Amino acid sequence: MDEARGGPDKKKERGPKRPRKVSPTYLENAALHYLKRYAATKSQLQRVLLRRVDRSIKFHGGERGEALAWVEALVAKLVRNGLLNDEAYAQMKAHSLRASGRSTRVIAQKLRLKGVPAEVVAKKVADATHEVSEEDAARIWARKKRLGPFRTQPGTREENRKRDLAALARAGFSFGIAKKVIDSNPA
């Protein structure tokens, strides 16, 4: 019962939540719950499960090697069953990032950080670039951030030119593309 209903708040009395003891069943349930909520790569899911394993071992004790074997077996099982697919994840992520105006460099970096293999990254970034060119992506990014021709106060465009070029460069676009977009007329 909480204080609003007239009783003490038990969560405050108990302190921090105890981690559950790891078992193959617990790890599988945790993995399925995570995959219901988030799209993930193999390495992302492994990281999540290993954090749970480490927390549990720190509290309950136990053998980390055995838990690592459980995690490896579980990830292999999920890949076999089609619940984990790095290629599908990379394709979805690359297309959504490109549609939101991200550069090729940023897309590749984000996919590599998520643990997608390099050859898959190269293929999926190339596929995304076929649909939306680098220049179109830069134009989308400039419109989102109100840079160059998309400034709300057109009179300040020339005095903010260097700042706008720098913003596009930080977003991963080349100087040539940034210059072309910033110096273009509003569409």
From Swiss-Prot:
Domain of life of the native organism: Bacteria
Annotated compartments: Cytoplasm
Broad class of the protein's primary localization: cytoplasm
GO cellular component, as recorded: cytoplasm
Pfam family, one: RecX_HTH2
Keywords: Cytoplasm
InterPro entries found in the cross-reference section: RecX_HTH_2nd, Regulatory_RecX, WH-like_DNA-bd_sf
Positions of region (Disordered): 1-23
Statement: the UniProt record of this protein carries the keyword DNA repair: no
Biased composition (Basic and acidic residues): 1-12
Gene Ontology process terms (BP): regulation of DNA repair
Family: Belongs to the RecX family.
Annotated function: Modulates RecA activity.
PANTHER family assigned: REGULATORY PROTEIN RECX FAMILY PROTEIN (PTHR33602:SF1)
HAMAP family recorded: RecX
Entry protein name: Regulatory protein RecX
Source organism (scientific name): Myxococcus xanthus (strain DK1622)
Annotated gene: recX
